[in-house]
């Protein structure tokens, strides 16, 4: 091992050290193993179920299983449900779980207490909040978003506009900030782009929308648990996000939504289910919305899924946000630099900004044969994913991804390209999930 730790400290930042061409040329796997040994987050890796022989770089699509999750879910089934039966709704706090877990997520995203609730899916929550935003801005008919936004965001807006049929429109532009105007009711943006990993300046975009009289709805699906967020400080109006990526809540984990306290009393939602009623067990035939964020709950909460999600969220809350972000930046800088160094002639075009302040916790590369290359990597134990038409994505969740994982992943990528294994016909057939 060379003096990597000392040199890193001397440079003042990981990115300055890693991107120094001279030092990078002499960096060894042993240097990175030393960095892993000194990593203040290293112990978190042991709290996840990670198969031997696998480098898991797809936590931006589905987080791995926290080791505490199976036991917690089994306890809910056998002890809470098994013994308390229907009494568990109150005795074990099931009925309060959307608000309880929501407030925990609220701490992760910097939202005010009582602003966040767990409910439904990201798509459904988008629909609910887009409809509420249009209702809150009568006379403004445009939902504004950007080219390349995640498809479900676009689909839900398209469906809502078609359903309303009152002259509303979805406007998709390359420069949403420049397109803000008096007809825009809500600016809908994804904070970290699903394909490239590029990240918006949340405070600046929110301020610009407010200056134009519009509300802002942020999709935090690739942000929550991955980058520092300050919804309250940035004066964010509305937000949604999913629970199965960086929050490690499990496949199909329920999503969350967040509404600024100043907007909650006037929030009129299009889905008015019984658990969003002011008195659900009064069984009033007329709907009256619950106070605050509770009105955003529609139906009976998925208790088992919420229990799994809560384990993942509790784990995230134990990790210092500053250390998470610092390591995320280092991992991405290392990955980008190693690919540029080891795969310079292999046709990989970085999609992810080199500037750490402009990206989330993933790196992506465009390649015309990206799908086949990713399948070849997966067969070799390096699990990332592919997004059409040509993007290879590598999620860098700092709770369990090590510096040596990045080194080893790029080494496998280099070898796959060197021997051309990705050309095998079995890697050409698209699976239903990519």
Tell me what each language-model feature is.
Residues 3-434:
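Pyridoxal 5′-phosphate
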